[in-house]
Regions:
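Tandem repeat scaffolds
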Residues: 1-195
Length: 195
């Protein structure tokens, strides 16, 4: 798809594989039951769009940006989010996540302060690196094999979350909330033995 401008449009049941969206702008659009597999964004923007029951796998980006996207009941796999950040003081790529499954996603140097991940989301095999995550809410979230590396997690809530690995030596954790028995895994980086 090339040089297309869409505002306030609704797209339902579309399936794209290997498609390159070049010089396209999507503003305030809704995508329902759509599939995007190994697609690319090239000089394309998505602004304040909503995705419902969509699957996005292996998204690639060149000189593109996404802002304030809402995802509900979506499967997001193998996405590196940092290249999708807007330059300057624009909103972050993700506005809300609800009942979503995120697998093998990478989030680098992103702002998730006060973000609520607890709305029925599952985050598997993903990485948060050098992210701002103060007051983020992961309460009850399945975080199987998800890592937090050098993140600011002050006052973040991990109670009843499971499967996470936190770099406690490189992350800021003051007043973060954890629950047992999962919190014992935080000690792994200290190379100590508990008995």
């Amino acid at each position: 798809m090339t040089e297309r401008y869409c505002e306030g449009e609704r797209f339902t049941g579309l399936s794209f594989a290997g498609e390159i969206f070049e010089s396209c702008d999507f503003a305030d659009c809704v995508f329902v039951d759509c599939s995007f597999t190994k697609c690319g964004l090239d000089h394309t923007t998505l602004n304040e769009c909503r995705f419902v029951r969509c699957e996005i796998t292996g998204l690639r980006s060149v000189s593109s940006s996404v802002q304030s996207l809402d995802f509900e009941d979506c499967r997001l796999q193998e996405i590196e989010w940092a290249p999708l950040l807007s330059s300057g003081a624009f909103p972050d790529p993700i506005h809300t996540l609800k009942d979503c499954s995120l697998k093998y996603n990478t989030f680098t140097e992103m702002n998730f302060n006060r973000f609520d991940f607890s709305n029925g989301n599952e985050i598997v095999g993903s990485m948060f690196a050098k992210c701002e995550m103060q007051l983020a809410n992961f309460k009850g979230t399945e975080l199987h094999e998800t890592e937090f590396y050098q993140c600011d997690l002050r006052k973040a809530d991990f109670r009843d979350a499971a499967g996470y690995k936190v770099d406690i030596l490189g992350s800021r954790l003051k007043d973060a909330k954890f629950s047992l028995p999962e919190a014992v895994n935080l000690l792994a980086d200290l190379k100590i033995k508990l008995s």
